[in-house]
């Protein structure tokens, strides 16, 4: 059968939360839920993860931070597994220009590049970082500088949460922007 895995998190976005994985070894007929991090303070909880499979049992995940403080603790989380999701490491990255904004990863197995898309809330900038997967795997502080892709709304809660996908050799990103109640979905293709 096909092995399937998905990450989960649970929180009320107030004080604490947990995260983990659900797995299936029978093509999704049955699932097993496992907690990896439990009762973590909200500032230490990786939420809304985006994962890519790098091959050879390696899974790379970037997750958002709920920490709004302008400190080194306000950075995206990098979760990694080298054994098909059995065990995990969790560390903060050097990506601190972001909070409460869902990331989106794309992995290009032909080039070995991983693309980390995210929206910088408050400043209103859609950003992307490009790294060789081998350079950041095991090295969460090694992400290169970001590139600004597009500008959007600056109200922190009315703009953000990018989703990106690779299509026909291009990357297409979608995010919401505006000022409530006048928000819209925007796209960029690179």
Where are the predicted features?
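Asp-box/BNR beta-propeller blade signature and adjacent active/binding-site loops
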Residues: 1-190
């Amino acid at each position: 059968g096909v092995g399937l895995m998905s990450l989960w998190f649970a929180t009320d976005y107030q004080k604490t939360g947990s995260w983990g994985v659900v797995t299936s070894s029978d093509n999704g007929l049955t699932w097993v839920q496992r907690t990896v991090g439990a009762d973590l303070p909200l500032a230490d909880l990786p939420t809304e993860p985006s994962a890519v499979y790098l091959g050879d049992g390696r899974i790379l995940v970037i997750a958002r931070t709920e920490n709004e403080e302008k400190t080194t603790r306000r950075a995206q989380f990098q979760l990694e597994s080298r054994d098909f999701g059995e065990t995990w490491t969790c560390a903060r990255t050097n990506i601190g220009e972001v909070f409460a904004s869902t990331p989106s990863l794309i992995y290009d197995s032909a080039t070995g590049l991983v693309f980390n898309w995210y929206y910088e809330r408050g400043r209103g900038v859609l950003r992307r970082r490009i790294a060789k997967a081998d350079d950041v795997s095991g090295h969460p502080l090694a992400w290169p500088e970001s590139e600004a892709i597009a500008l959007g709304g600056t109200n922190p809660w009315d703009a953000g949460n990018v989703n990106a996908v690779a299509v026909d050799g291009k990357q297409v990103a979608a995010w919401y922007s505006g000022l409530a109640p006048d928000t819209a979905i925007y796209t960029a293709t690179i």
